[in-house]
Swiss-Prot record:
Pathway: Cofactor biosynthesis; adenosylcobalamin biosynthesis; cob(II)yrinate a,c-diamide from sirohydrochlorin (anaerobic route): step 10/10. The keyword Cell cycle does not apply. The record marks H422 as: Increases nucleophilicity of active site Cys. NCBIfam families: cobB (TIGR00379), PRK01077.1 (NF002204). Its cofactor is Mg(2+). The lineage of its organism: Archaea, Thermoproteota, Thermoprotei, Sulfolobales, Sulfolobaceae. Belongs to the CobB/CbiA family. This is Cobyrinate a,c-diamide synthase.
Length: 434
């Protein structure tokens, strides 16, 4: 598979929409796989709309270099081109070791820059030159200008750029805007207008951007990584129930694929008061439970089922929004209590300061996620805050990050474990046996 990476000098440059538009435009001629640098759950949804295929996260912090290369190779099989969307600015991250730049270097992928040119002209030449020559061990091949006001504006920008090929531009258009919410861009599930937005943006890209040159610039250099054979179980698979609806939609595609090797996956919707009676394991991911408090409070059958399964010792794993749902009460911005499942004696305020960043967790107690004394990396991404925690058993000591309380995460009751950290199951320290 050929591959190219789209990056920028900062967040807010239009990467997600332009990347999705390019994916959609190229999909008319090629089989395109989307990838996303970093831990983001939302942008891959846009990629899926654009290509028709799930987008795959590539995160050096959580996955490590070899697993990133394996995922790129594995999910690139049978595709003509992989398009990787970067995160933040090209050199941003915990440090450059976990940046988009490092991802491009590790995966031997050439870079095309997307630069927001609103309110600048010739200065774009200095921005592009700075990005290109700040490091010399990656290949910045092209640049696309965003928010170009006129042909004259485009010419000023184009004439200022040296040593990098200008591939075209996207004109300023007030209709080209993805709305934001407190955790970033609105999710695809929330906004059905996203499909029309990507379609419109792709029409502009087809008109103003050299798509053939993008495909030509993409690299097919060998990743020099061995792909292990799929270790899918040959026996009868146990059933795993996975919460999935607009309140719980934050799942990595690769995590689901890893679980499919061992389990028959059946999805259920807490918002619709559903449950899976014969489940032998349960997984509740993150999302936006704070936007669906009334419906979740009324999901009495789901909550009763989860509580009974927890008491019976069934393995339940929950992340972030899942932790909130398994708690006792969620308190909204008007200080109104909403009763949740109550497996954990924890009350959580649903809207507080944003907590976002990578985590590093040490397993200090035996559990079914990580062997004791092992260390695993994840990330936190929420605006909620526990205000009452009457639980004593936690399986993780937080070495980097915040966790639930007092640098502890992974609250445990029976065989139920819930944490604020999201984990990527490709990490070799994890034992996803459920």
């Amino acid at each position: 598979m050929k591959r190219i990476l789209l990056s920028s000098d900062r967040s807010g440059s239009g990467k997600t929409l332009i990347t999705s538009a390019i994916m959609r435009a190229l999909s008319k001629k090629y089989k395109v796989r989307g990838f996303k640098a970093g831990p983001d759950f939302i942008d891959p949804g846009y990629h899926k709309i654009a290509t028709g295929f799930p987008s795959i996260n590539l995160d050096l912090w959580m996955m490590g270099k070899n697993n990133v290369k394996r995922s790129l190779a594995k999910y690139g099989k049978e595709f003509d081109i992989g398009i990787i969307e970067g995160v933040m600015g090209l050199y941003d991250g915990v440090d450059t070791l976990y940046s988009t730049y490092e991802l491009a270097k590790v995966t031997k992928t050439p870079i095309i820059l997307i630069i927001n040119c609103s309110n600048i002209g010739s200065t774009v030449g200095a921005i592009v030159k700075g990005l290109k020559y700040y490091r010399s061990d990656v290949s910045i091949r092209g640049v696309i200008f965003n928010k170009i006001a006129s042909e004259t504006h485009y010419n000023y920008c184009r004439n200022a750029v040296e040593d990098v090929e200008v591939l075209g531009y996207v004109p300023f258009d007030k209709n080209l805007e993805i709305k934001s919410r407190h955790l970033g861009l609105v999710t695809v599930e929330d906004n059905r207008e996203v499909q029309n937005l990507i379609r419109y943006a792709s029409e502009l890209v087809e008109k103003y951007v050299d798509l053939d040159k993008i495909y030509e610039m993409a690299s097919d250099e060998d990743l020099e990584i061995d792909l292990p054979e799929d270790n899918e179980s040959n026996g009868v698979k146990r059933k795993m129930a996975i919460a999935y609806d607009p309140a719980f939609s934050f799942y990595y595609q690769e995590n689901l694929d890893i679980l499919k090797n061992k389990y028959e996956l059946e999805f259920f919707s807490p918002l619709n008061n559903e449950y899976v009676e014969d489940a032998e394991a349960i997984y509740i991911g993150g999302g936006y439970p704070e936007l669906h408090l009334n419906e979740l409070e009324k999901s009495t059958r789901t909550k009763k089922w989860l509580k009974n399964m927890s008491y019976a010792g069934v393995k339940i794993y929950a992340e972030c929004g899942g932790l909130m749902y398994l708690s006792k009460n969620l308190i909204d911005e008007n200080n109104k209590n909403h009763s949740m499942t109550g497996i954990f004696d924890i009350d959580i305020k649903t809207k507080d300061k944003l907590t976002i960043g990578y985590t590093e967790l040490e397993a200090v107690k035996e559990n079914f996620i990580v062997n004791k004394n092992n260390v695993v990396r994840g990330h936190e991404f929420h605006v909620s805050k526990p205000i009452s925690v009457n639980e004593k058993e936690f399986v993780f000591k937080v070495r980097i990050g915040k966790g639930i309380i007092n640098k502890l995460d992974g609250v445990k009751s029976n065989n139920t474990v819930a944490s604020y950290s999201h984990l990527h199951f490709s990490n070799f320290q994890l034992r996803i046996v459920f």
